[in-house]
Amino acid sequence: MDGDGDPESVSHPEEASPEEQPEEAGAEASAEEEQLREAEEEEEAEAVEYLAELPEPLLLRVLAELPATELVQACRLVCLRWKELVDGAPLWLLKCQQEGLVPEGSADEERDHWQQFYFLSKRRRNLLRNPCGEEDLEGWSDVEHGGDGWRVEELPGDNGVEFTQDDSVKKYFASSFEWCRKAQVIDLQAEGYWEELLDTTQPAIVVKDWYSGRTDAGSLYELTVRLLSENEDVLAEFATGQVAVPEDGSWMEISHTFIDYGPGVRFVRFEHGGQDSVYWKGWFGARVTNSSVWVEP
C-alpha cells in the first residue's frame, strides 16, 4: 500500500527512552517535595507569627510545656523576644512550679537563676554508686582489705543497732582489725554538670556518710573527700582524721558542704575507711553505709 495506507509511512508517537523516564519521574518527585517543603515552611511561619502575637503570660505557659533542652537549644533562637523569655527567670520559675520542684506561689526575687536551679534540681541524685553494699563492692575502687578485709553484712548485725533513718537501707560495710579503705571518683562532667556551671555558679557539693561501731569493741573511722581538677590537682579537701567510734552501736552522720571552691573542679574523690581498736580477728571495726555525694541547686 502507498500513501496513508502504507504501514511504514504511518507515524507513531515517540516513546521516552529508558534513560529519560527516571529523570522525568525524579523531576516530578523533586517538584512535589519542594511544594511540600514550602507548605510546611509557610505553616511554621504562620504558627510562629501566631505565637508571637500571644500575650506574654500565655506565651510563657506555652513555652513551659516544652522540654527544657528544646527551650535552650531551639526556642531561644527563634527571635529576640523568645530568647529574652527563655533567658529570663519567670519561664523557669513556672517550669519549676509545674514539675513540683518549688511550691506554687514562690516569688521571683527569691532566686536569681531559676534556669540553673531547674537543671540542677532535675539532675539531683546521689552520685555515689552502691552506697550500702547491695552489690557487694561494685563501684568502689582503691579497695584496701586490711586484716580480714571488708565484708558486707545485714543490718543490724552482731552487737549492732538498726538504721532507723532510712528504711530502704538494709546492709552496711564492716571493716576488720587493720585499716580497710575504699574510694570512688565522680566525673562531674560525665554526670551532666557542664564547665561553665561548675566554674561560675559553683553549686554546693554536699558529702554525707553514716558510721557506727559494735557494742562489744572499740573502732576507728575516717573520711577524706577531695575536689580535683582535670589534672587531678587537689582544689579543696575535707578530712575527719581518725575518729574514735562510741561503743554503743548507734549510727552517726557526718556531713560537709563545699562552697566557693573556685573554678576548675571536675572530679570528686570520696574515700572512707575503718578498723577496730582491739585487733580482734574478724569484723569488729567501724561500719559504714548510706554514703552520698550531691550537687545541690
Curated annotation (Swiss-Prot):
Function text: Substrate recognition component of a SCF (SKP1-CUL1-F-box protein) E3 ubiquitin-protein ligase complex that mediates the ubiquitination and subsequent proteasomal degradation of target proteins. Involved in the endoplasmic reticulum-associated degradation pathway (ERAD) for misfolded lumenal proteins by recognizing and binding sugar chains on unfolded glycoproteins that are retrotranslocated into the cytosol and promoting their ubiquitination and subsequent degradation. Prevents formation of cytosolic aggregates of unfolded glycoproteins that have been retrotranslocated into the cytosol.
Gene Ontology biological process terms, A to Z: ERAD pathway; glycoprotein catabolic process; protein ubiquitination; regulation of protein catabolic process at postsynapse, modulating synaptic transmission; regulation of protein ubiquitination; SCF-dependent proteasomal ubiquitin-dependent protein catabolic process; ubiquitin-dependent protein catabolic process
Tissue: Detected in brain and cochlea, in epithelial support cells and hair cells of the organ of Corti (at protein level).
Domain F-box: start-end pairs: 48-95
Protein name: F-box only protein 2
InterPro entries, per database record: F-box-assoc_dom, F-box-like_dom_sf, F-box_dom, F-box_only, Galactose-bd-like_sf
Signal peptide interval: none
Membrane topology recorded in Swiss-Prot or TrEMBL: Peripheral membrane protein
Residues carrying the site annotation Important for carbohydrate binding: 159, 177
Biased amino acid composition, Acidic residues: 16-47
Disordered: annotated segments: 1-47
TM region(s), chain numbering: none
GO cellular component: cytosol; dendritic spine; endoplasmic reticulum; glutamatergic synapse; membrane; SCF ubiquitin ligase complex
Organism this protein belongs to: Mus musculus
Keyword line: Cytoplasm, Endoplasmic reticulum, Lectin, Membrane, Microsome, Phosphoprotein, Ubl conjugation pathway
Positions of modified residues (Phosphoserine): 106
